Amino acid sequence: IQNMDNFKPCFGKFEKTSKKTLSLIFNDKSEILFDDHKTTFLHERNFNIDQGYKIFEGDTKDIVLFCDDKISNQHDNFIKKAQTFSLLDEEKLKIYARASQLNTWIYKTKYCSRHGTKFENVTDDLGKYCNECGFSHYPKMSPCIMVVVKHKDQILLVQHKNSPQFFTAIAGFVEYGETLYEACLLYTSPSPRDSAL
């Protein structure tokens, strides 16, 4: 995919249509399946996995998310999240970011936090319904900021907190009642609070 302009984000259970399908496949470790040459994670077949979710809709193709723990034994090309970023261009990063987050919500969030009851399958509005309490749960949204501090032709990078070999732009979560501007000031001040990274 060279351009995501022809695709719009959506969500719904995958149903076979006359449209072509591009499949993304995660295993139970949240690793994504690349092709043999490590050039793409979008496959033009679904590997006979039954349940999937349409996450992008295009004019002639849809992009569908699949997760299957059995497929890991059949393929050697599953790649961990940290290793994928050097393999992705901007357009594929958009697809990967959405797919990875949805994969975590759909396949890793299985039980109601109130009762421990197993959820029903995810619905078309991304909700998961608990039969015990009748409450619909939705993915958590965590507003955050990413700040780039520039001076002439230089950019300020900070050492990644959990992976000292990585450097990154300044990033962190926005606290309740805090504006984006206030969060930027706090993370870029001489004694900033701990960055989320």
Regions from the PLM with identified roles:
Residues 1-89:
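N-terminal alpha-helical interaction blocks
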Residues 26, 127-169, 173:
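N-terminal strand-loop-strand
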Residues 79-102, 109:
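A gly/proline- and charged-residue-enriched helix-loop-helix capping module
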Residues 101-146:
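Cys/His-rich short segments
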Residues 170, 184-189:
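Hydrophobic alpha-helical positions that pack around
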Residues 180:
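Phosphate-binding active sites in nucleotide-utilizing proteins
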Residues 187-197:
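Conserved small/polar residues in nucleotide/adenosyl-binding loops
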